[in-house]
From Swiss-Prot:
Catalyzes the attachment of L-aspartate to tRNA(Asp) in a two-step reaction: L-aspartate is first activated by ATP to form Asp-AMP and then transferred to the acceptor end of tRNA(Asp). Keywords: Aminoacyl-tRNA synthetase, ATP-binding, Cytoplasm, Ligase, Nucleotide-binding, Protein biosynthesis. L-aspartate binds at E175, R221, H450, R493. HAMAP family: Asp_tRNA_synth_type1 (MF_00044). Its main location: cytoplasm. One of its GO terms (biological process) is aspartyl-tRNA aminoacylation. Residues 199-202 are annotated as: Aspartate. Belongs to the class-II aminoacyl-tRNA synthetase family. Type 1 subfamily. This is Aspartate--tRNA ligase. One of its GO terms (molecular function) is catalytic activity, acting on a protein. It comes from Lactiplantibacillus plantarum (strain ATCC BAA-793 / NCIMB 8826 / WCFS1). InterPro entries: Aa-tRNA-synt_II (IPR004364), aa-tRNA-synth_II (IPR006195), aa-tRNA-synth_II/BPL/LPL (IPR045864), Asp-tRNA-ligase_1 (IPR004524), Asp-tRNA-ligase_1_N (IPR047089), Asp/Asn-tRNA-synth_IIb (IPR002312), AspRS_core (IPR047090), GAD-like_sf (IPR004115).
Amino acid sequence: MKRTTYAGLINEDYLGQTVTLQGWVQKRRDLGSLIFIDLRDREGIVQLVFSQEFSADALAVADQLRGEYVIEVQGTVVNRNADAVNDRMKTGKVEVEIHDAKILNKAKTPPFYIQDDINVSDELRLKYRYLDLRRPEMQRGLKIRNGITQAVHSYFDANGFYDIETPFLTKSTPEGARDYLVPSRVYQGHFYALPQSPQLFKQLLMGAGFDRYYQIARCFRDEDLRGDRQPEFTQIDMETSFLTAEEIQSYTEGLIKQVMKDVKGVDIKTPFTRMTWQEAMDRFGSEKPDVRFGMELKDMGVAVSNAGFKVFDNALANGGLVKAIAVPGGADQYSRKQIDAYTEYVKRFGAKGLAWMKVTDDGFSGPVAKFFKNDGDFEAITSAAAAKPGDLLLFAADSFKVVSDTLGYLRTAIAKELDLIDQDQYAYLWVVDWPLFEYDEGIERWVPAHHPFTMPNEEDVHYLNDGEDPHKAHAQSYDIILNGYELGGGSIRIHTRELQEKMFKALDFTKERAQEQFGFLLDALDMGFPPHGGLAIGLDRFAMLLSGNDNIREVIAFPKNSKASEPMTNAPSRVSDQQLADLDLNITNPVTDDEPTE
């Protein structure tokens, strides 16, 4: 028999038709003279009815069926009885009366139910990923991901972009995250690196004159094992020649508009709001602000400067800041114990503590309220904080970074707790005019805020000259933000050798090191490179957000776990002594199979 349609597409349009369906047994109900089977495929579930009246042979087959058996059936689509209609199912008004059935394959009892909202460990789900992927919510996520990629291809093709592949085996340029290294058998002692991004190759394609490039690119980063990260991920990559940052942003908005229309059926407004990096940090305490709700950071320096509260006074005297957020209705919703828990948590951002007051009709209450009882204090503070009676004021007093990180975190965490966020809203935002460099406290040196190929703002190029302070420079870079997540980022690139060498020098590269690692790029920039720029969007995160998930693993078919391993195939695994010998490699300190080195 040849399948005529998908089970999940059966509806009243098929009434009276004979259909052939193939799929998995989701559920079986035996009423003696009748057996009901819920048949599942990638499009959904339809109810099958087996009866002696329709076919004794088919009923005999149904009697053998169990969960996850793969079957093939043929039958007639009919209306359900009025009392059996199920409005929760797309197919809930109809059923299929079966007159022919065949078992294509049997199945052992699976280790978990093939349904949504299962309560099992992530490790078990990953070990049996091929079963996990049968669940409807997993199939929906990957369907959305597929819809995004189809829209991407359609949009870029319609706008004159070439889809060009770049290499997986390339040169290691150890900046930023660690590379995944691939030893060469032919050149023993030499290594390829898997690309962290197609960055340099797409720039070289602009130098080659292709003008507009895109690629759905696989990328690899050997990062520390923490957070919602994957060692391999996918990005929607683009690069253009002779366009301004605003023109590249316009193309990106057009792409996102098409994706939202095709995948979600939502018509979003363009152009998106634009906000400088400084404004984002000042107002929201984050370079990826969620603008679906208020509770913005407010500068309290003037309002609290004469109160005699040493914590605030010392911060201001040392060139720091005092800022606050007003939690609407928080005075009644947060106990001292809850606030103390937040106080302890924000120490991870470098905060020494958290000052707070509750706003009442009569003034302030709380640990620091005694410092703010003078005439005018109430009006000055509530006005500066945009607060009203019933609100909770949370203060941070420290450096710009500590204050921003602390209140930026609290703002988002509290908004989630109080359900202040419209989950149906898609708030896209451009954050522009980034610093060219940022200080990495972990390695105690200045690093590029994006990457070392980013063009400074025209008025800031002189900061890369000898005797100037390059850390004052801002960049022609831009990030696209969606609902508090960095969806992607890009920049105008440096297109002259002279300026690129100055950039490397600002990063403490010697000429020899720059030539060794990036000589091919520097040489290319000497050969008539056009002005160019581009952007990359994280496909995994985009699919995660559009599918309503909170972890990118839910929209990747075969992801790694938090230890960068893959329980289903047991990757990474040991290899044979012969394979190591072929590569002239010797493992001096092997670990056990289930013990990562980090």
